C-alpha cells in the first residue's frame, strides 16, 4: 500500500474542523415549537455531550455521533483517534458504551480503498478496547476523507452526568493535558521535535474510561469532555448552564511538553482564533500565550469535572485516578456569577 499523508487531503484536522460555537448557534435556530418527549432526559438545549433517553427501567440510553477529517497522516491512527473521540461522549455522560456504527466519507478516485480499510481497522481496534462491536455503518464518496462513529451507551438514570449541574465551590479537574492542536499543527508544519513525535497521538488514543467510575461519585456534579471548542469553550458551557462563573489557575492547568515553544514558533491552529472570536467576550484578561493554550482545539481531549470540595469526594476521586494511572490536581473552582465575565484566569 502506498504511503500517503492523509492530512494533505483535508482542509481541517480533527476537532479543529468543528463549526465555531457562534456560527453553530445560528445554524441550530428554529422557528418550530420544540417536540416534547418526557423520556428525553438530555437533548440539545444544554449543549451537552450526548442525548439521553429514559428506558423506563432505571436505565437510560445514550446516543452520540462524532466524525472529522484526518489529524494525523497514518490511516490506522486516524481511525483509532476518531473512534476514541466519538466514544468519549458516552463516558462524559457517565455511561458505558455498548455498540458503535461507522461513518465514512472517502474520495474513492483519489485515495485507494485499502487506505480506507486501514482507517476502519483502526476504529475497530479501539471499539474492541472499549469492549464494544463496530456493528455496521454508512459510507459515501466524498471530496475529503472523513471518519467517525455513532455510538450507543447505557447509564443508570440517577448516574447521568451533565454539563450544567456544577455548584458554587466545586473544584475543577482535567484528566488530559492541553496542547493537542498546537503539537499537531507543529507536526503539519514539520517543526515537531523528534522527542515529541507520537505524543499527541498517544493521548488522543487514550479512552476516557474513568468517566464510568466518576459517575458513581456523588460529589461529581458536572462532567464534559474537552474537544474542539477548547478548555475555555467547554468550561463556558458549564458556567452558562450552571449559572456560575469559574476561576482557573493557569499554572495548574496540565499541558503537553514543548507546547509553549511551539506556540512561540507560530504553531497555533486556526481553530484557536475561531474559538476566541466566539466566546472571548465571556473571558477575563489573559495573555496571548494563555489564549493559545486555553482556546486550543483538542481532539479526543480529557474529561473536565466539577467536584464538591469535601475530603471524602477528593479521596474517592483520587482513588479512581490512581486506578487509571491519571494524575489529578485542581485547576480552578466554580464561583457565584457577579457580572458578564464567565471565566477568570489567575
Curated annotation (Swiss-Prot):
GO CC, alphabetical: cytoplasm
Domain of life: Bacteria
GO biological process, one term: selenocysteine biosynthetic process
EC code(s) of this entry: 2.7.9.3
Binding sites annotated in the UniProt record for Mg(2+): 49, 89, 225
Annotated keywords: ATP-binding, Kinase, Magnesium, Metal-binding, Nucleotide-binding, Selenium, Transferase
Annotated catalysed reactions: hydrogenselenide + ATP + H2O = selenophosphate + AMP + phosphate + 2 H(+)
Top-level class of the enzyme under EC nomenclature: transferase
NCBIfam families in the cross-refs: PRK00943.1, selD
Function: Synthesizes selenophosphate from selenide and ATP.
Record-stated family: Belongs to the selenophosphate synthase 1 family. Class I subfamily.
Identification of the protein by name: Selenide, water dikinase
Organism of this sequence: Photobacterium profundum (strain SS9)
Gene that encodes the chain: selD
